[in-house]
Amino acid sequence: MQHGNGPDIIYYAYANKDFTDIEGEPKPLFLPKNEKSCIDGDIIYKDGLYHLFYKTEGNGNGIKKATTSSLTSGQWTESDDYKQQTKDAVEGAGIFPLIGSDKYILMYDVYMKGKYQFTESADLEHFKVIDHAVSMDFHPRHGTVIPITQKELQRLFKAYGKPEGFCSKGGSSTHLN
C-alpha cells in the first residue's frame, strides 16, 4: 500500500470477529532498509522464523526474502540475494510446503511471459527450477496455494462439481475421488 508519494510497503491489519471490518488502522509490517517499494508479500513459518518473500521495486527488481522471529516487531533480517531463478521480470511470489516432503515450493508470476515459474527448496535459501514437474491447465495471476483436507475437498466437489479429468496425487500418492 502506498501513502502519498512514499514507497509501496507491506501493511498488516486485524479483522473483527465477524470479518466485516478491520480493527484500528493498518500498520506497517515490512519496509526494506533501502526504503524502496516492496509488494506482493507471502509469509511462511519455519524453524522458529517467519520468512517473508516479496517483490522489490525501484532497485533491482525481483523476489527477495526477509526473516523475523516476531512478525509485527519491525525487526527483520534481509537477504541480499534474489530468490527467483530467471532473468525475466517476476512478481506475485507464493511460498508453500510440499505435503509429504521436507521441501517448499516458491512460485512466482513471470508476468511479461504470461506464465508461472516453480522452484523447490529444503532450506528456503537455495531454490532450483522444477517447471518440468508441474503442469497447469489454467493461467492464474498472483496465485495462492491453500492446503485443504479431504473433507473440505469433498464439500467443494458437492457445491461446485468435480472438474472433468480431475485427479490429484496427495502426499501418500493417493488419488482423490
Language model features by range: what are they?
Residues 1-89, 98-171:
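Beta-rich carbohydrate-recognition and catalytic domains
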